[in-house]
């Protein structure tokens, strides 16, 4: 069955969890092969529509990155957004729209993605500037982290001082402070009791 999928769709199958054949939790069971097939069909509908991710973001009322995540099976489609996606990409089948709403997304990634030059350079930039960004976040917000759950990401471009096109990536994540773990505040029963 994998041999029938396009190479790009096969790359979407996560390799970090080789024994994971499907995932279920109050949702329709979805095999990873089925998800890869759905992603291929949805991306084909996008290509046929000639819409960009920016166009889709405007139609759906989401960021361009989130629009891409929806199509790549990395975010769950809500019923409200499904109606907008149906209007924007009428070639997406009812079955695929239903599956995008009823299946939980695979938010993992194939380790091979880090070999893709753009992805690797973004990873390199985060690791290169990571310690400095952490120091500034701690200085401005305190001891904690930026959430990647309550998080928005948007990608755009600007023009540099020499007229060159420049990439602008905005990360907008909720600050989550670390807490002092006081026993009296812990509502869970201690495993030591």
From Swiss-Prot:
Q: Would you tell me the protein name for this molecule? A: Cyanate hydratase
Q: Which reactions is this enzyme annotated as catalysing?
A: cyanate + hydrogencarbonate + 3 H(+) = NH4(+) + 2 CO2
Query: What Gene Ontology molecular-function terms does this entry list?
Result: cyanate hydratase activity; DNA binding
| Gene name per UniProt | CYN
| Family in the record | Belongs to the cyanase family.
Output the InterPro entries linked to this UniProt entry. Cro/C1-type_HTH, Cyanase, Cyanate_lyase_C, Cyanate_lyase_C_sf, CYNS_N, Lambda_DNA-bd_dom_sf
Q: Which residues form the active site?
A: 121, 124, 147
Tree of life domain: Eukaryota
Spell out the SUPFAM superfamilies in the cross-references.
Cyanase C-terminal domain, lambda repressor-like DNA-binding domains
* Listed PANTHER family: CYANATE HYDRATASE (PTHR34186:SF2)
Known EC number(s)?
4.2.1.104
Q: HAMAP family, alphabetically?
A: Cyanate_hydrat
Which species does the entry assign this protein to? Phaeodactylum tricornutum (strain CCAP 1055/1)
Function, as annotated? Catalyzes the reaction of cyanate with bicarbonate to produce ammonia and carbon dioxide.
Gene Ontology biological-process entries: cyanate metabolic process
| Alphabetized UniProt keyword annotations | Lyase
